[in-house]
Structure formats: C-alpha cells, structure tokens
Amino acid sequence: MEAPASAQTPHPHEPISFGIDQILNSPDQDSAPAPRGPDGASYLGGPPGGRPGATYPSLPASFAGLGAPFEDAGSYSVNLSLAPAGVIRVPAHRPLPGAVPPPLPSALPAMPSVPTVSSLGGLNFPWMESSRRFVKDRFTAAAALTPFTVTRRIGHPYQNRTPPKRKKPRTSFSRVQICELEKRFHRQKYLASAERAALAKSLKMTDAQVKTWFQNRRTKWRRQTAEEREAERQQASRLMLQLQHDAFQKSLNDSIQPDPLCLHNSSLFALQNLQPWEEDSSKVPAVTSLV
C-alpha cells in the first residue's frame, strides 16, 4: 500500500525568531547562505562557478590596517571583512607559507623611543658633578706633590725604564806618574794628608786622584795577598800529603824484626809474619815447628 504523496514531500522549515541572525541583529535575514566548500567552510573571496557571493560592509576605521596586507597574500585573494554585527569571517584554507603577511606598522601603537648610550652621555646629575670635581681635585693634588715627573719613552718594556746616569770618564795617568805611585806604595801603603798633598803636587795630580789611586791599589794588593796565601796553603797541604804517603810506604817496605817471644811460639810467629797486603806470598818465611 503506497503512502500518499503529500506525506513524502518535506515541509520547509519556518524561520526561528531567536536564531543566530536575530541575536546578532543581522539585517540580511533572507539572503542566501554563502556557498561552502568540501570541508564546510564558506568561501570569502568568491564561490566557485562564478556566482556572486554575499557582500559585506567594509572594515571600520580602527581595523583599516588589517585588511591591506592580506589582499595579495597568495594564489587566491583573501577578503577580510567584518560581518554586520562585528564578526570577522575567516577563510577555511590557510594561506601558503610563502605568503606570510608583513608586519602591520599602521596597526601597532607607537612605542616610546628607548634612550641610547649616546643620549645618556649628555645627562648631568648633581652627584656626577661632585664625583667629577673630587677626581679633578685629587689629580691636581697628586700633580702638585710630584712636580718633577720623569717622562718615559714609549716602546719596548726595557726601554721604558729611567735611563741610568752617565758614568764619569776614567782618568788615565802617564807611565811616569804610575811608576812614582808604585814606588811610593811599595814603601808606604798609607799616606797622611800632608804626604798625599805633597805627592799630588809633585806628580801634577789632584789630592782626590792620589787618594783614589791608593785606595784601589790597596784593594788590589789585599786580593793578591789573599790569593798568594791560599796558593801557599794548598802547596803546603800537598807537600804534607806527599810526605805522609812516603813515610807510610817506607814503613811497609821495611823488614819486620822478629820478636824474641814469638820465636818460641809458632802461632805468634805466624801472626807476626802475616802480611795480607803483599801480593807475593813466597816472601813469607815458612813456619817451623820448634816443638
């Protein structure tokens, strides 16, 4: 039994008075819904097939910088706009990785400029002025204490040292003066003030030159005397060692006189004639038994 045809035909849904469009106060209640893609998302740029889609009002002035960077963001155009109630419709497909939108300079608020080091260098504070004045006074006082500062050369570290004082040139004497000084020194090692002045006048020298020469000559004489005494002492030591060695060798080479007590005792006689340091044992007399 077939059902009547009127029962199979679906009835159109009546509009609900408390739907989303009524809540959002959308004036476009009777407009056709936007075409949707395979995944259920609506096309914002334009539906396939060339059919005109729903038109949306433009962005308000506060969102003017949001839509411009995304107009040419990929192979298809993306139209960011707001719904009548302020809802932003988002495309179902994300833009390609190569179409990354640039930063939004117009949408970002103006950040206050950060002070740099160069700008901070010109700032002056009271405590900075006092510190500078203290350092300046301190350096001024140090410079006043050392007015005669030695300037050092710039270069190798060994060249930065203070140059040494120049030595006085060595005074050279003539052969006649040296001979007269040596003769007087052999006769007299020390001179009095009057004797020194007379010798200096006779040799056409100054008192200081004669005094310095005698001081240096005495130092040389003491060193030579000490060296000679040391050489004599070493020579005497070597002589004593030689004499001791000769005496020891002579005592070894002398024949041992037999003791009368050992003649009647074979053991004592053998010990008396025993000489272990001798290499030739044939010289040792044979022990004869006297018993």
From Swiss-Prot:
Region Disordered, annotated ranges: 1-56
One annotated GO biological process: negative regulation of neuron differentiation
Subcellular location: Nucleus
Domain of life: Eukaryota
DNA-binding region, residues: 166-225
GO CC annotations on file: chromatin; nucleoplasm; nucleus
Phylogenetic lineage: Eukaryota, Metazoa, Chordata, Craniata, Vertebrata
UniProt keyword Cytoplasm present: no
Entry annotated with the keyword Nucleus: yes
Alphabetized PANTHER family for the sequence: IP01054P (PTHR45921), T-CELL LEUKEMIA HOMEOBOX PROTEIN 3 (PTHR45921:SF1)
Record GO terms (molecular function): DNA-binding transcription factor activity, RNA polymerase II-specific; sequence-specific double-stranded DNA binding
Keywords carried by this UniProt record: Developmental protein, DNA-binding, Homeobox, Nucleus
Protein name per Swiss-Prot or TrEMBL: T-cell leukemia homeobox protein 3
